[in-house]
Design a protein with these regions (language model features):
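Flavin (primarily FAD) cofactor-binding/catalytic cores of flavoenzymes
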Residues: 1-111, 123-156
């Protein structure tokens, strides 16, 4: 995508004899269609009042901490441009620090403000679709997590 060899297209409206026609009216002649749907984020074991990923959006501080429910954490709920396992490891280290009270969280209002800031950044960077709601750039996200781990230690 970054090199321009792959073009991002909107949803398919229909396929005629040789072309795929997209919802924006553009057309592409195709030989093969690869149907990759991604996934829908859902937590059927939680009440919707706890977490409701409408449009695949999750309101989690650094995609890890639920600001309204102390002790509710998520690991690996991100779509990195890079590897997920090191991110999950760093999230786990942070969560362990929080559980062991070696680190603290910022005020709820600050966490919610950061969640909204991240959401706006995603909307500005990508098309407004459920596809990119948990997208992260590996290195900046890892730095942000480490920065939060370090800040959290000063809050206890």
């Amino acid at each position: 995508v970054g090199h321009g060899k792959v073009k991002i297209k909107p949803d398919i409206d229909y396929k005629d004899v040789r072309d795929v026609v997209f919802v924006d009216g553009s057309r592409v002649a195709v030989d093969t269609i690869i149907y990759a749907t991604g996934y829908k984020i859902s937590f059927p074991f939680f009440d919707d009042t706890v977490i409701n990923p409408e449009n695949n959006e999750v309101s989690l501080y650094h995609l890890t901490v639920h600001p309204d429910y102390k002790g509710l954490y998520f690991v690996g709920l991100c779509q990195p441009l890079g590897a997920v396992m090191p991110i999950a490891e760093r999230q786990s280290i942070w969560i362990a620090d929080l559980i062991e009270e070696k680190a603290g969280l910022p005020p709820e209002s600050e966490m919610k403000q950061e969640i909204q800031k991240r959401r706006e950044s995603i909307y500005n960077r990508y098309d407004n679709s459920p596809r990119h709601t948990i997208q992260v750039d590996f290195f900046p996200f890892m730095k942000d997590l480490q920065r939060e781990i370090d800040r959290g230690k000063s809050r206890v």
